Structures are given as C-alpha cells and as structure tokens.
Amino acid sequence: MPAIAGPSSSPQKHVVGSRSESIGGVRSAEVNTSRKRKLISDSAAEVSATVVLPVNSISTPMKWKSPRRCAVSIPKTSDEEIKEDSNEKLENPVISVCLEVKSKWNPKDDEQMKAVKEALHVSKAPSTVVCREDEQRRVFEFVKGCMEQKKAGSLYICGCPGTGKSLSMEKVRLQAEEWAKQAGLHCPETVSVNCTSLTKSTDIFSKILGNYESGKKANGSFSPLQQLQRLFSQKQQQSRSKMMLIIADEMDYLITRDRGVLHELFMLTTLPLSRCILIGTVFCVINVHFLKSVSYGQTSFKFKVRICPPGVANAIDLADRFLPKLKSLNCKPLVVTFRAYSKDQILRILQERLVALPFVAFQSNALEICARKVSAASGDMRKALCVCRSALEILEIEVRGSIDQEPKGPVPECQVVKMDHMIAALSKTFKSPIVDTIQSLPQHQQIIVCSAAKAFRGSKKDRTIAELNKLYLEICKSSMITPAGITEFSNMCTVLNDQGILKLSLARDDKLKRVSLRVDEADITFALKEIRFFRNCLL
C-alpha cells in the first residue's frame, strides 16, 4: 500500500506512534493479529496521521472507521489542547495576520506606548484627510475657479464638531498653493483666523488688513474695515494679480446682535475690484441631549447623545437668516456640508492611524464598538480618538498594577486593548452628569431614589411623600437599616428636588406633597448597579 507521507517528512506520524505506544495492552494485541488485520490497522494509523496534519500540509480523503478502531488509532487530546484549538478558531483572522506580520506589542514598553498615544492624538494631522475626499474636492474646485477667473467669491462650511472641517481647509490651502505654482499663477495670500481667539468680533478686519498690507503704515483716520473697503474699490487694484484667501474658522462667533460684522465680512467679496476668496467654517448643532442605553453581552452602559440633523438646517439657512442683503445682490455664498462621521468612516480613520505602527495594540472588535457608539452619539472623530486613548490608559494602568504585584513574572500573552477596556472608556466618556450625582448621594438618599424608581414603574406618575416613605421603610426594614424619621425624610426629598432628581409639588402638609421622578429609571439602575444592595433593591 502506498504511504501517505514518508517517515522522514511526517513528524506528526512519529508523534502519533509515540503516543499510541503508551497504550501498551492495545498495541501488543494489535501486533499478534493476522496480516490482514495488521494492514487495516496500519492504514487506520496512516489516516489518523493525516488528521493531525496542519492545514497547509498534504491531506487525503478520510475513511470511515468504527468507534473501536478510532479509540485505538487516534491519540487522546487533553482539555488544554482542545481549549487552545478553540481559542485559535475564535481569534479574529485580521488580528492574527497582523500579529504574525508585525512585531509583538508590549504595553510595558514606554516607547511603544508613546507611539500609540501620539498616533491617536487629536493634534497629529494625518497626511491625507480620509472620508472627506468629496467635500475637500468641492472646496478646492471653488478656490481653483476663483483663482482662474481672478474673481472674488464666498463659501461657508457647516458641520458638527470633529467632522474634519478645519483639517480639510488646511489641506485645501496647501493644494491651492501647489496648483498655483504648477499653473504659473501667483500663490494666494492666505489669512487664517480662528474667530474664537478674537477679543472682539471686529478684530478680524485688523487681522486681514495686517496681512494684506504688511510693512505699510496704517491709516489712523479710517477703521480697518473702511481701509479694506477702499482697497477693494480702487482702480489700481486691477493691476494687483494676487488673490487673497481668507479662512475664518468658527465663523459663527462673529454673529452679533445686529449681524453687522458677519455681513460686512461677506460684503468684501461683492466689491467691484475685490479678489477675496472667503471660506468660513460654521459650527452647527441642535442642543438637544438625551441618554441612550446600550448593552453589549452582559455589560450595559449609557451615553449622552447630541442630535446633529442630517441636513444641518440651522447652518444651511445662515445666509437667509443673517445675510439677506447678499441674497438680494445675487451673491449668496456656496454651502458645503460636512456630515457627522458614520461607523464605517470612524473605523476606517482609526485603522488608518494605527496601520503605520509596527505592532497591533487594539483588537478589531474593540475599535468597532468604539466607532459604533461614537457615531451613534455624535459622529465626532475627536471624541473617538479620546475614547481610544482612554482605553489605552486603562490598559496601561492594568499593566502597571500587574508589574507591581509580580515584578519578575512573565509578560502575559496578547495584552492588547480589548472589549472590556473599550467599554470602560466609553462609559467614562459618555457618562451622564446625573449618574455622577446619584453615585455621590448619601446612602439614605440613594435608598429614596431606589424607592422612587420602584414606585413609578407602573402607570402611576406621582405619589405622595407618605406613600414613598412607606416603600422607603420597607427597604430599610428588609436590609436592617435604621430608617430616618418622616421630617428628615421630607427634608431629604427636598434636597433631591433641588438636585433635579425628584419633583415636589406644594401642599400644606408635607405628607400630602406629590412626588414624581425627573430622571429616567435606567439612569438610576446604571448609577447603582455596581452595588449589590441597590441592585437587589431595584429588582
């Protein structure tokens, strides 16, 4: 019978043989059988050798064997080997490949930890703006068209915080300068102003004038705005070939009561000889917050959601609300909307930042849950980077603690940022202020809050203080805690009312005051779930 693999090329076969030698009685009985039985047994042993071959080794179709023959030919596998094999199957294939290709990540190495933190820092500008190619192209085409035609124009960008507006504007500025050199045109004079740094909103005109006429003595008889208006209205301005690119970041800070500053800034682009290209970024968000509870397995946490509508209506109509004269002059600025990042976009940006590192510091499912929760909350990329850095710090504290306990112990395998680290970081970042308030309350006030949560689970929306006190006494009695008197109980309810947890109505008698719950029951459960006593009280 032809052999499946030769003795010298099949170490697995020798392993099988050595293991099967330990079964002494069975092996000796097998030697004393007939030649036919021996051939069958040998073929079974060869088939069993193919079973333990690696995936990349040569394999043949397996033959059916009876349970008795399997017990003889196949060696027993320990529980540890089965567990190890199952862990290898459950392991993420992407991380496995990366771990094989890249060097091993050691969280105890200060240099490696520093490199990961720098890669995830907000101040680190990536070489390319990922997931904002279309928006960046629209802005660049606008600037390019103005420079080719030597014509002024205005554009504003609206979007939620952390959607890449400022970073994209910096890339557009560099693109415009590079394109102007290639086209043989003068590079535009660029003025970048962060409006949050201005002492007064009118200071933006001084910034523009100082850059436009650097080295020239300012005319004290005219204001900076008047001097700019004269410069862009004089005939000799036609001989000036350079364009001026004004980038006003956080331009909504210029919105005053009379809207005069914002209006005059855009009006500079409508002057007959103006060569201003004005680009402004506008922060826009509807300030509505609510708490959303998310469960992952047996772990649940809450985070604050800030609504940023898909159309960003309060920014798109900025020209209609604050710049009505521009619309009448047919000079309405162009609008480019930067929408909040989606889950896939956040995940891609995180991977782009980490792929350059020579090691793997995050599990893929940990990055995925971070992207999912941040996109559901706000779509703020800066928040996602903050969460990842926080998860990395949690791992660092965990590793430092293990070093203190076992200074000479071996380094544990695969000490990367896992799901539990990321969930803890998300809970820390998006935790509601009311959760902190409930957690910092004294014990008896926390018992009152638990009593209120149980009292309002049904259809009844409010109860009297006497009814709430009855539930409070039941919890104290079952836990053998000395309860407070009715007067002290009423005073504690007043304190909870002042903190926005309970709502008390007015009544002549304290016992007749109506009590209702201002916070969500899920907030109370989330705040007190770590304490077994309160967890049992809320059942």
Curated annotation (Swiss-Prot):
Tissue: Highly expressed in roots, flower buds and etiolated seedlings. Expressed in leaves and stems. Highly expressed in proliferating cells such as root meristems, leaf primordia and young growing leaves, as well as cells undergoing endoreduplication cycles.
Compartments in which it is found: Nucleus
Membrane-spanning intervals of the chain: none
Domain of life: Eukaryota
Region (Disordered): 1-40
Induction: Cell cycle regulated. Up-regulated at the G1/S phase transition and then decreases rapidly as cells progress into S-phase. Degraded in a proteasome-dependent manner in proliferating cells, but not in endoreduplicating cells.
Pfam families, per the entry: AAA_22, Cdc6-ORC-like_ATPase_lid, Cdc6_C
Keyword flag Cytoplasm: no
Miscellaneous comment in the UniProt entry for this protein: Cells expressing ectopically CDC6 have increased levels of endopolyploidy.
Family, similarity comment: Belongs to the CDC6/cdc18 family.
PANTHER family listed in its UniProt record: CELL DIVISION CONTROL PROTEIN 6 HOMOLOG, CELL DIVISION CONTROL PROTEIN 6-RELATED
Functional summary from the UniProt entry: May be involved in the initiation of DNA replication. May play a role in endoreduplication. Could act as one of the factors that contributes to maintain endoreduplication competence.
Name of this chain's protein: Cell division control protein 6 homolog
Species of origin: Arabidopsis thaliana (Mouse-ear cress)
Taxonomic placement: Eukaryota, Viridiplantae, Streptophyta, Embryophyta, Tracheophyta
Gene from which the chain derives: CDC6
